[in-house]
């Protein structure tokens, strides 16, 4: 599961993934986190 700090980060992550980027690379690029839990932390709500 990916969690982003804001909508902009989420959009960057989604665009990166759509373009064929890996989850890790896209998370790093967009400032998002990849987590194993089912719910995102409050500081990464998107």
Swiss-Prot record:
Disulfide bonds join 3-40, 4-32, 16-26. GO terms for biological process: defense response. GO terms for cellular component: extracellular region. One of its GO terms (molecular function) is toxin activity. It comes from the Eukaryota. Keywords: Disulfide bond, Plant defense, Secreted, Toxin. Pfam families: Thionin. PROSITE patterns: THIONIN. SUPFAM superfamilies: Crambin-like. The keyword NAD does not apply. It is found in: Secreted. Thionins are small plant proteins which are toxic to animal cells. They seem to exert their toxic effect at the level of the cell membrane. Their precise function is not known. PANTHER family: THIONIN-2.1-RELATED. Monomer. Belongs to the plant thionin (TC 1.C.44) family. This is Viscotoxin-C1. It comes from Viscum album (European mistletoe).
